[in-house]
Amino acid sequence: MMMNSPLDYDVLLEIMSYCPATEMAKFRLLSKECNKRSYEMSFINRHLHRTNSFLGYIFYYKDNKWFRNHSCFVSGVDEKDKNRINLAFLPPLCNVSIEACDTHHGILLCVDVVFKGRQKIPDYIVCKPATKQYRIIPNPKTRFGTVATGLMVISSNPFRYKIIRVSDTWARVGRDGVYNLRESLFE
């Protein structure tokens, strides 16, 4: 016969500190105490260190003077030795912007708009800043202007993802009064 014993939260938090962020939600559902202690800064710092993760915000903005795209990472923890997100490991491009991200896997979708002749042709790059890995993906057909871009990671090992691109068809409102958009799905 099994005896009911209280959970040892210190042991449980130690195990959780090695888990990826995608598994944290499952542990937080175990109890209110486990959920509360997993948001304490001592646990967050230990988890970030052990999983080589970042905690913070990515701000995306456009420079009105030079019409360039910029992104800035603001750390959510006050650590001096923690590296900030840096996209300098990407191939030398002129105007890289972060279009979408998957926060569970730490994956970013970056776009660099390059003028080839008189046309703007985007280069799409899927990257993981924590490991400095990137993959330049083939350009989709960009007949229409991009309205929105989304990224969904299917699996991290092997690395599989889907990118959805919503574009404007120039036919703003159809005969039925509906706003027309096109979507492209590529992997």
Swiss-Prot record:
This is F-box protein At5g41720. The lineage of its organism: Eukaryota, Viridiplantae, Streptophyta, Embryophyta, Tracheophyta. PANTHER family: BNACNNG10540D PROTEIN (PTHR31672). InterPro entries: F-box-like_dom_sf, F-box_dom, SCF_F-box_component. Residues 2-49 form the F-box domain.
